[in-house]
Amino acid sequence: MKNVTDSFVSLGHWPSAGSFGVNTDILATNPINLSVVLGVLIFFGKGVLSDLLDNRKERILNTIRNSEELRGGAIERLEKARARLRKVEMEADQFRVNGYSEIEREKLNLINSTYKILEQLENYKNETIYFEQQRAINQVRQRVFQQALQGALGTLNSSLNNELHLRTISANIGLFGVMKEITD
């Protein structure tokens, strides 16, 4: 752009030695030069300007048509979306109503199952207590029996002498003899 401006400025400073030039000084130009320049601009610029305006008009009209088509499509999609929204709202209301009754049913089922589990745990607890009681009783019996046996063995060992030992053996032999006679 600067080169074009420089070339017009340089045209105005050429020496006037019989050559053709454009006078760029507005105050020094004559009406003929102005009318020639304006005529050339109007003649050649009219077509260019007309084409530019026609192109701009076509683009604006195309944009308006596209906008109308998009608007129509948007309105159609909006109506479909509203219909879907109404349907979803109705389904949501139905789910809400069904959900409350389902929640109550699940709540009752949960309470009943929890009650059954608590009963089972109570039964297991009672069985465990009974088992532990029986085990404790058996342990006490074993200890009492062991202590009684140890006491009896201690008493026998302390009071046992050879004479008593021989008498016991003789008595047992006698018992075996009597048993043998009975079986024969």
UniProtKB/Swiss-Prot annotation:
| GO CC term (a single one) | proton-transporting ATP synthase complex
Q: Major place of localization?
A: plastid
The question of whether Transmembrane helix is a record keyword is answered with yes
Q: Which key words tag this protein in UniProt?
A: ATP synthesis, CF(0), Chloroplast, Hydrogen ion transport, Ion transport, Membrane, Plastid, Thylakoid, Transmembrane, Transmembrane helix, Transport
Give the molecular function GO annotations.
proton-transporting ATP synthase activity, rotational mechanism
The organism's place on the tree of life at top rank: Eukaryota
Q: Does the keyword Transmembrane helix apply?
A: yes
Q: Where in the cell is it found?
A: Plastid, Chloroplast thylakoid membrane
Q: Where are the transmembrane segments?
A: 27-49
User: In what way does this protein cross or attach to the membrane?
Assistant: Single-pass membrane protein
Check the record and name the InterPro entries matching this protein: ATP_synth_b/b'su_bac/chlpt (IPR002146)
CDD domains, sorted: ATP-synt_Fo_b
**Its quaternary structure?**
F-type ATPases have 2 components, F(1) - the catalytic core - and F(0) - the membrane proton channel. F(1) has five subunits: alpha(3), beta(3), gamma(1), delta(1), epsilon(1). F(0) has four main subunits: a(1), b(1), b'(1) and c(10-14). The alpha and beta chains form an alternating ring which encloses part of the gamma chain. F(1) is attached to F(0) by a central stalk formed by the gamma and epsilon chains, while a peripheral stalk is formed by the delta, b and b' chains.
Family of the protein in this entry: Belongs to the ATPase B chain family.
The role this protein plays is:
F(1)F(0) ATP synthase produces ATP from ADP in the presence of a proton or sodium gradient. F-type ATPases consist of two structural domains, F(1) containing the extramembraneous catalytic core and F(0) containing the membrane proton channel, linked together by a central stalk and a peripheral stalk. During catalysis, ATP synthesis in the catalytic domain of F(1) is coupled via a rotary mechanism of the central stalk subunits to proton translocation.
Look up the further comments and give them. In plastids the F-type ATPase is also known as CF(1)CF(0).
* This protein's name: ATP synthase subunit b, chloroplastic
Q: Which organism is it from?
A: Gossypium hirsutum (Upland cotton)
